[in-house]
Amino acid sequence: MNCNYLWKSSALLKNLHRRAKIIFEIRNYFFNLGILEVETPILSNYSVTDVNFIPFKTKLQITKKRMWLVPSPEYHMKRLLVQNIGAIYQISRSFRNNEFGGPYHNPEFTMLEWYSPYCNMFDFMKKVEKFLVFCLKVVQVKYISYQRAFIKYLNIDPLLAKKRELLDLINKFKFNHLISDCDSISTLLEILFTLKIEPNLNNKKLIFVYHYPADQAILAAINDNDSRVSDRFEVFFKGVELGNGFYELTDQAEHIRRFKLNNIQRRHKGICSVEVDQFFLKSLSRGLPPCSGIAIGLDRLIMLSLNLKTINEVIAFPIERC
């Protein structure tokens, strides 16, 4: 490794000063709203079963117990919500072993996670909109459903499409090398959304995409009026995904079902299964209040607010320099 220049920070020092100022302003924003800042562990007895995450693991020296670096503070924060702590947010480090390369990823990154009890998805999106407008100084905001986005940009209804129709689109766009015979409709939709719809979100509007298909719910609740969709949304700016939000699933039994399904999917993909977080499950038995939440990539948010191109321009020492 050539250390002649890698010893220096990838971010200009002036950008690190600007980063600190933005984080100060964010903390002040939440303080003025009466939203409590919390701190939860980044080293945990459990990880998450989400198929999209490969966690970092380590062992305690004395007991040899396996521990995990958290990919998100979600479970710990929800355990606080069960105790009726009220609206909370956190700025913390998160770790994902499969997020590396490109302008927007680093295995260690800064997450802004925010939960608002007794707030439905649409009301919460408005709160998120107000916050992001404050951070990014944007004027135009657009809302579009996942279904409408597919119809608008690909002329296909994702809630009605057959697998053959999606495979034909994949073939048309020459994405065949990205799929396998066993890929589900959900996987095909994710590929098409990432490669053909997200590029169309590359403008100066803040864009909310909501009501993702039910089998892409992750830990979002299924919509009360249409069981084909979940109360999940994502927000984009200049083609960059900034945040992933839910009206949160609260039912313990449904959590267990989804966790089991996740581990089956992990094994099919050749990824190790993950023990389910028993502390989190126990908290759910006490009752998670109705709430909405979002995880925002803070490095990306700062990058965009400073009109920069990569998160390495706002991180002191990314993975190749640390």
UniProtKB/Swiss-Prot annotation:
Pfam families: tRNA-synt_2. This is Elongation factor P--(R)-beta-lysine ligase. It catalyses: D-beta-lysine + L-lysyl-[protein] + ATP = N(6)-((3R)-3,6-diaminohexanoyl)-L-lysyl-[protein] + AMP + diphosphate + H(+). Belongs to the class-II aminoacyl-tRNA synthetase family. EpmA subfamily. Homodimer. HAMAP family: EF_P_modif_A. The lineage of its organism: Bacteria, Pseudomonadati, Pseudomonadota, Gammaproteobacteria, Enterobacterales. GO terms for biological process: lysyl-tRNA aminoacylation. Keywords: ATP-binding, Ligase, Nucleotide-binding. With EpmB is involved in the beta-lysylation step of the post-translational modification of translation elongation factor P (EF-P). Catalyzes the ATP-dependent activation of (R)-beta-lysine produced by EpmB, forming a lysyl-adenylate, from which the beta-lysyl moiety is then transferred to the epsilon-amino group of a conserved specific lysine residue in EF-P.
